[in-house]
Amino acid sequence: MTTPTDQQPDANHYLRHLCRLNDTQEVTASEDIYNQFGVLLIAKGSRINPQTQTQLNQHRLKKSLDGQIALQSTLTDELIFQRALKMLEKSPELWSLHCSNRFEAPFRHLCLSENLPLQVRQKLTVMDVQLPDLFEHCLFTGWAAALIAKEIGLKPDICKNAYTCGLLHDIGLLHISADVQTPLSEDNWRALQSHVVIGQRYADDCGLEKSIGRGILEHHERLDCTGYPARKAANKLGLLGQLISSADLLHSLCTNELSRSRHSMHDALPYFKIHRGSFNEAIHSAIIRLLSRTTSDQLDQDTDIPPVNLQRVRDTNIQLKALWLPLLELSQQASICAQPEWLKVSTMMVSIIGILNESGLDDELLSSWLITEMDLDDQANQLDLKEIDAMQYELLWLFKRLGWNLQCLIDAHETPESSASTALAAYHTQLNEQLEQAFSRYLEPKQPSPSSLHEQEQEQEQEQAPPSQQQLANAENAKNAADSDPKSATLSE
């Protein structure tokens, strides 16, 4: 079976971006471009237009295309910094978080002392023009990753690498077809995983520190083995990937669920509580501290926020229990098989069991409270229901990710027919049916193009705009390779 690491970067999609950019500014060959056999394809100074695109598409190049092109106008470190500030200033909460944590001077220093290579700034320029939403997502991720690193107390050079890694973490999406990025089906999810491999290779080819390339590769991995592309064990993961992963998820929350329902960043706390096992303790604690310093008081108190759908909370709680109950036995059956993919699926199941136990969503007292008659005008009840609804929604996506991995395992045919494989296949069928029903409760009739929550699984459906201009990863993501991170439903309360 083809894995993400087997796939080669697709220059065709990137060439399309360059051709479109050539409509607004000159994009030329900075040197003679040869194919792998040394045959001249494009002479130095030639414009990258549809004619040269066709010529280049027919050959494997001797060198990477990125090192052989020149843009008439390229982002500078100062311009990237100013764009990041503009992005923060658009949100009073983000700007307040930036200033209250005294991050103005440190952020300016790490942005302007970075001296990003020309090749990197050119790539970011292409992203800025062709995929502006993705570029803003990368600005946020670089800023947030550096802020979290500072909150932890990491050294300035690590904060700087976190910023750079965040800027480039989704650079591989320039090489991925927009058709793959949305909607995020099982097949598209597999293809999308290659963007982290492409991004790592690009960072390494640009001469950036190896830790940056590794961070790009691992930014959709999770400590509980629920990520991709390799579902590495916790002791095999580096720090940068986990910093980017957490920043990726934060952006997905802020730009999708929380912004649409006029909630504050403080309301992201339930989501990160669910993902406690996904990040190391230092990163998780830093995020909780940062979010705890924000406040919902900045919301317009005169605007009515729709109450939580109580019946949805009740029904979802029942379904989550039905999906959770078979996991322990299934995880034990899967662990008996010595093959790595089976063990990873078993680990994912155990992780979900632990998350449910820690969240208290499986508690009988909670179930009893949910079915009682309650005063929905009571603010305390609404706050509790809002947090429960948010956590349950995240758990549904953990089950969704489990389903994708089960499908990969089933398709791999790694073991002969057995009681364990039969049980997993039956559970996979049940899981898909239950999730389809559960997610349908979150669909907004007036929003036919629901946005995703992640990474990573981290993209947004944008039917009103040309795909070449507005596609996101979203995420995780991706923001949901990431979870970074894309989703088929939006949370409406």
Where are the language model's segments positioned?
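Acidic/His-rich, divalent-metal-binding segments that scaffold phosphate/diphosphate chemistry
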Residues: 50, 65-210, 235, 299-304, ...
